[in-house]
From Swiss-Prot:
It is found in: Cytoplasm, Nucleoid. Pfam families: YbaB_DNA_bd. HAMAP family: DNA_YbaB_EbfC. Residues 84-104 are annotated as: Disordered. NCBIfam families: DNA_YbaB_EbfC. This is Nucleoid-associated protein Dtur_0258.
Length: 104
Protein backbone atom coordinates (compact mmCIF):
# COMPACT_ATOMS: atom_id res chain seq x y z
CA UNK A 1 0.00 0.00 0.00
CA UNK A 2 1.10 3.53 -0.69
CA UNK A 3 2.58 5.68 2.03
CA UNK A 4 -0.33 7.44 3.84
CA UNK A 5 1.68 10.65 4.09
CA UNK A 6 2.14 10.64 0.32
CA UNK A 7 -1.61 10.20 -0.11
CA UNK A 8 -2.22 13.15 2.23
CA UNK A 9 0.21 15.28 0.21
CA UNK A 10 -1.65 14.38 -2.98
CA UNK A 11 -4.96 15.24 -1.31
CA UNK A 12 -3.62 18.62 -0.22
CA UNK A 13 -2.40 19.31 -3.77
CA UNK A 14 -5.81 18.31 -5.09
CA UNK A 15 -7.51 20.70 -2.66
CA UNK A 16 -5.19 23.52 -3.72
CA UNK A 17 -5.89 22.84 -7.40
CA UNK A 18 -9.63 22.75 -6.68
CA UNK A 19 -9.50 26.13 -4.92
CA UNK A 20 -7.58 27.61 -7.86
CA UNK A 21 -10.06 26.19 -10.38
CA UNK A 22 -13.02 27.51 -8.37
CA UNK A 23 -11.44 30.97 -8.46
CA UNK A 24 -10.83 30.69 -12.21
CA UNK A 25 -14.45 29.65 -12.78
CA UNK A 26 -15.64 32.71 -10.86
CA UNK A 27 -13.53 34.92 -13.16
CA UNK A 28 -14.32 33.16 -16.46
CA UNK A 29 -17.13 34.83 -18.39
CA UNK A 30 -19.26 33.20 -21.07
CA UNK A 31 -21.84 34.82 -23.31
CA UNK A 32 -25.06 33.24 -24.47
CA UNK A 33 -26.95 34.79 -27.36
CA UNK A 34 -30.25 34.36 -29.14
CA UNK A 35 -31.95 35.90 -32.14
CA UNK A 36 -28.67 36.56 -33.90
CA UNK A 37 -27.31 38.55 -30.97
CA UNK A 38 -30.51 40.47 -30.22
CA UNK A 39 -30.45 39.09 -26.66
CA UNK A 40 -27.17 38.48 -24.83
CA UNK A 41 -26.58 37.04 -21.39
CA UNK A 42 -23.15 37.17 -19.76
CA UNK A 43 -22.45 34.87 -16.82
CA UNK A 44 -19.54 33.34 -14.98
CA UNK A 45 -18.57 29.72 -15.52
CA UNK A 46 -20.05 29.21 -12.03
CA UNK A 47 -23.42 30.15 -13.57
CA UNK A 48 -23.79 33.58 -11.94
CA UNK A 49 -25.58 35.95 -14.32
CA UNK A 50 -23.65 39.22 -14.70
CA UNK A 51 -25.47 41.00 -17.55
CA UNK A 52 -28.59 40.77 -19.66
CA UNK A 53 -28.52 42.91 -22.81
CA UNK A 54 -31.44 43.43 -25.16
CA UNK A 55 -31.24 45.34 -28.43
CA UNK A 56 -33.71 48.25 -27.98
CA UNK A 57 -34.79 47.85 -31.60
CA UNK A 58 -36.64 44.64 -30.74
CA UNK A 59 -38.58 45.92 -27.74
CA UNK A 60 -42.23 45.90 -28.76
CA UNK A 61 -44.98 45.59 -26.16
CA UNK A 62 -47.08 43.57 -28.60
CA UNK A 63 -44.34 40.95 -28.99
CA UNK A 64 -43.26 40.39 -25.39
CA UNK A 65 -43.68 36.63 -25.78
CA UNK A 66 -41.03 36.57 -28.52
CA UNK A 67 -38.63 38.56 -26.34
CA UNK A 68 -39.26 36.17 -23.44
CA UNK A 69 -38.44 33.21 -25.69
CA UNK A 70 -35.22 34.91 -26.82
CA UNK A 71 -34.17 35.59 -23.22
CA UNK A 72 -34.80 31.95 -22.27
CA UNK A 73 -32.82 30.76 -25.31
CA UNK A 74 -29.89 33.07 -24.50
CA UNK A 75 -29.90 31.85 -20.90
CA UNK A 76 -29.85 28.21 -22.02
CA UNK A 77 -26.97 29.00 -24.38
CA UNK A 78 -25.00 30.74 -21.62
CA UNK A 79 -25.65 27.90 -19.15
CA UNK A 80 -24.45 25.32 -21.66
CA UNK A 81 -21.25 27.28 -22.23
CA UNK A 82 -20.71 27.76 -18.47
CA UNK A 83 -21.11 24.03 -17.85
CA UNK A 84 -18.69 23.22 -20.67
CA UNK A 85 -16.06 25.57 -19.22
CA UNK A 86 -16.57 24.12 -15.76
CA UNK A 87 -16.26 20.53 -17.00
CA UNK A 88 -13.13 21.46 -18.96
CA UNK A 89 -11.45 23.01 -15.92
CA UNK A 90 -12.56 20.25 -13.54
CA UNK A 91 -11.25 17.62 -15.94
CA UNK A 92 -7.77 19.07 -15.59
CA UNK A 93 -8.05 18.70 -11.83
CA UNK A 94 -7.77 14.92 -11.87
CA UNK A 95 -5.07 14.64 -14.55
CA UNK A 96 -2.34 12.33 -13.32
CA UNK A 97 -4.32 10.93 -10.40
CA UNK A 98 -5.00 7.19 -10.17
CA UNK A 99 -8.80 7.49 -10.11
CA UNK A 100 -11.37 5.20 -11.70
CA UNK A 101 -12.67 6.52 -15.06
CA UNK A 102 -15.88 8.57 -14.88
CA UNK A 103 -15.49 9.49 -11.22
CA UNK A 104 -15.56 13.23 -12.00
Amino acid sequence: MKNPFEAMKQLKKLQEKMAKIEEELEQTLVEGTAGGGVVKIVMTAKEEVKEVKIDPEVVNKDEVDILEDLIAAALRDALTKAKEKSAEKMGSLTDGLPLPPGLF
